[in-house]
């Protein structure tokens, strides 16, 4: 068959199949257009569940006469004009498909007037003909879109519409979601001539709570806890349900990304994971959350309906949401948790405490906040200021100011958000100090010590190496290996420092770094939850081995449940996250099966070998990064390197030999 270019009418109807699923889809697209036009008042009239009439009227900026015809054309929009605009979308719409798709399956009338025009103009388009007729009309500044007889020309699509009550229920839900995203906009909804919803514009905090109560119910508002969290370009605020409150169901789950209502699995997973251990069975958390992300870091252009987004750094966003929600849950249950600690000696693994800095988890500090007193509670106005799409308030942007809070439950108080503050302060001070240290500063003399390891003598070394032992000052703290000059035999680094030249074994350095990450002093590795738990089928012998060494395995941040012969890996520590976890688990159990008695040190060394540099071939850039990590995380190995880690090169005999040869040649001539 020959390939033909589709006529515009058919192309629009195909596009309508993605954009216009039901009357609620039409309402969503038209409401978003009104918000993009800057409307502060929107009136919605529905007849017969939207199948007969959908009319949306706003007081936005309007559309000029010259643009009316283009407004109904496909791929015509005023919201983006360049590729750069597409990569940083802040408007609700941007495709230019909605009006064209809607008009191809209905009888559409668009009436609009701008402030600069003395009269309004009306455009009419109907079904497959797509002929747009423009004529004068009477209308205030703003726009009105009337959609009559939806799917009148596509009987198959019309048959799929549900009952009038069901279709209006979907429209009502869309309006509720839009109303929660823009507190500053007044929205009125009428069905069959009867006013059903009236959301007045909310400027004050108590008005925000009134709208929240009207949409989510008094029960949610009474039990909800305010959440405010910020880190760099990421910010989240809103309300989450008290973990000890009775769960009503999953119908109150509203999430917005840069003001856009969203149904994203990554966000839902992060929230559910934060509530893990607080809910039972099929219970679902209730929440209303507003996530603000740098528009360059989120891709909205995923689906025509714009229900989904794609984050450029999804793991970072997931961890940020997870820690923000978990921090609030911990604050309100800290009294209960402290009692559990006294009884059990430690928190359960399901709470997943913050990981240690050396492991490098995505951790986020909350701005410091003074403890809330009874007097400040009375003055606090808290809650969400302004519309969701307009970013943070001045108070929320300033880490030095106390964030306003509101007490929704009987005992909830917002306390100092310091779960990660100390850790982040230490990290910031490390960076600041590093900037002040010269690239290759003079270092204290190295004290080479023999730790009893054997070295590989198979490689031929053409450089004469003479170990040198010099006492180092114990008071020195700024230790560095020096500068990496070259890579020798693909696994040794030739380094230069104030003490001369040295040859460093990169494989040994990598092994020591992995051991330091896996075996931190005086603490166990903290588990970091997986985005999706992994299931591994185990034999009976492997299950018995796991049960025998379960306590030791959990010390490395590995959280596993055994059920019906299958292991479910829920969390691992960050050093292990990039590994093939099912394969690593079976290898670990096979290793432990051969050891009757196995210590934590032995397991740590075994894991370090599994994590070692895969290729065994090192580049100079990799060597520089490795030594920087060793100097930062394991200064003891820099202060007193073992003989199988570093050997200083004595150049004096080589220089003497060269001078001797030159003297001989000079005598001959």
From Swiss-Prot:
Source organism superkingdom: Bacteria
Keyword DNA repair annotated: yes
Region feature Disordered, mapped onto this chain: 361-409
CDD domains assigned: HATPase_MutL-MLH-PMS-like (cd16926), MutL_Trans_MutL (cd03482)
Sorted UniProt keywords: DNA damage, DNA repair
Spans traversing the lipid bilayer: none
Record's compositionally biased regions (Polar residues): 363-384, 393-402
Pfam family, one: HATPase_c_3
Any Gene Ontology biological process: mismatch repair
Record-linked Gene3D superfamilies: 3.30.230.10, Histidine kinase-like ATPase, C-terminal domain, MutL, C-terminal domain, dimerisation subdomain, MutL, C-terminal domain, regulatory subdomain
Molecular-function GO terms, alphabetical: ATP binding; ATP hydrolysis activity; ATP-dependent DNA damage sensor activity; mismatched DNA binding
InterPro entries (alphabetical): DNA_mismatch_repair_CS, DNA_mismatch_repair_MutL, DNA_mismatch_S5_2-like, HATPase_C_sf, MutL/Mlh/PMS, MutL/Mlh/Pms-like, MutL_C, MutL_C_dimsub
GO cellular component: mismatch repair complex
The UniProt record lists the keyword DNA repair: yes
Function text: This protein is involved in the repair of mismatches in DNA. It is required for dam-dependent methyl-directed DNA mismatch repair. May act as a 'molecular matchmaker', a protein that promotes the formation of a stable complex between two or more DNA-binding proteins in an ATP-dependent manner without itself being part of a final effector complex.
HAMAP family to which the protein is assigned, alphabetical: DNA_mis_repair
Family that this chain belongs to: Belongs to the DNA mismatch repair MutL/HexB family.
Entry protein name: DNA mismatch repair protein MutL
Organism annotation: Proteus mirabilis (strain HI4320)
Gene it is expressed from: mutL
């Amino acid at each position: 068959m020959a390939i033909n270019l589709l006529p515009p009418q058919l192309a629009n109807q195909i596009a309508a199949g993605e954009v216009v699923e039901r009357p609620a889809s039409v309402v969503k697209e038209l409401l978003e257009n009104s918000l993009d036009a800057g409307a502060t008042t929107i009136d919605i009239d529905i007849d017969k569940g939207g199948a007969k009439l959908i009319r949306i009227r706003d007081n936005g900026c309007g559309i000029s006469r010259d643009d009316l015809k283009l407004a109904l054309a496909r791929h015509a929009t005023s919201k983006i004009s360049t590729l750069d605009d597409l990569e940083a979308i802040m408007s609700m719409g941007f495709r230019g498909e909605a009006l064209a798709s809607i008009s191809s399956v209905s009888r559409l009338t668009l009436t609009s007037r701008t402030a600069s025009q003395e009269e309004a103009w009306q455009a009419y388009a109907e079904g497959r003909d797509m002929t747009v007729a423009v004529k004068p009309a009477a209308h205030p500044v703003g726009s009105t879109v009337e959609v009559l007889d939806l799917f009148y020309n596509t009987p198959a699509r019309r048959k799929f519409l549900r009952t009038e009550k069901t279709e209006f229920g979907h429209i009502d839900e869309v309006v509720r979601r839009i109303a929660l995203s823009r507190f500053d906009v007044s929205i009125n909804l009428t069905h069959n001539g009867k006013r059903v919803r009236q959301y007045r514009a909310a400027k004050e905090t108590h008005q925000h709570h009134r709208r929240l109560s009207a949409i989510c119910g008094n029960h949610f508002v009474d039990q909800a806890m305010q959440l405010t969290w910020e880190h760099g370009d990421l910010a989240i605020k809103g309300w989450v349900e008290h973990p000890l409150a009775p769960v009503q169901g999953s119908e109150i789950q509203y999430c917005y990304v840069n003001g856009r209502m969203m149904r994203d699995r990554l966000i839902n997973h992060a929230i559910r994971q934060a509530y893990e251990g607080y809910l039972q069975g099929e219970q679902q958390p209730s929440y209303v959350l507003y996530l603000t992300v740098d528009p360059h870091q989120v891709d909205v252009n995923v689906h025509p309906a714009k229900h989904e987004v794609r984050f450029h750094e999804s793991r970072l966003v997931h961890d940020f949401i997870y820690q923000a929600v978990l921090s609030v849950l911990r604050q309100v249950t800290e009294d209960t948790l402290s009692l559990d600690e006294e009884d059990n000696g430690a928190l359960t693994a399901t709470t997943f405490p913050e990981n240690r800095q050396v492991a490098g988890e995505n951790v986020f500090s909350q701005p410091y906040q003074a403890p809330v007193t009874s007097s400040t509670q009375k003055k606090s106005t808290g809650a969400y200021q302004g519309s969701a799409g307009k970013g943070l308030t001045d108070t929320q942007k300033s880490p030095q100011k106390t964030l306003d809070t509101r007490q929704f439950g009987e005992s909830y108080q917002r306390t100092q958000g310091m779960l990660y503050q100390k850790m982040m302060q230490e990290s910031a001070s490390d960076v600041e100090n590093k900037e002040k240290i010269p690239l290759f500063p003079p270092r204290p003399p190295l004290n080479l010590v023999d730790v009893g390891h054997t070295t590989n003598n198979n490689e031929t070394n053409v450089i004469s190496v003479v170990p040198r032992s010099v006492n180092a000052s114990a008071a020195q703290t700024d230790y560095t290996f020096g500068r990496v000059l070259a890579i020798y035999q693909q696994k040794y680094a030739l380094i230069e420092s104030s003490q001369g030249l040295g040859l460093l074994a990169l494989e040994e350095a990598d092994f020591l770094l992995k051991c330091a990450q896996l075996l931190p002093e005086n603490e166990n590795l903290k588990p970091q939850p997986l985005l999706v738990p992994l299931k591994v089928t185990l034999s009976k012998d492997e299950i018995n081995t796991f049960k025998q060494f379960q306590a030791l395995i959990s010390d490395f941040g590995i959280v596993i449940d055994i059920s019906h012969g299958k292991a479910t890996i829920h969390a691992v520590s960050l050093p292990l996250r990039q590994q093939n976890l099912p394969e690593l688990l079976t290898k670990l159990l096979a290793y432990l099966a051969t050891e009757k008695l196995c210590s934590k040190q032995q397991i740590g060394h075994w894991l370090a070998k599994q994590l070692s540099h895969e290729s065994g071939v090192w580049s100079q850039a990799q060597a520089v990064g490795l030594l920087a990590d060793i100097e930062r995380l394991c200064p003891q190995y820099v202060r007193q390197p073992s003989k199988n880690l570093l050997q200083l090169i004595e150049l004096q005999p080589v220089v003497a030999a060269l001078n001797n040869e030159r003297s001989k040649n000079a005598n001959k001539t």
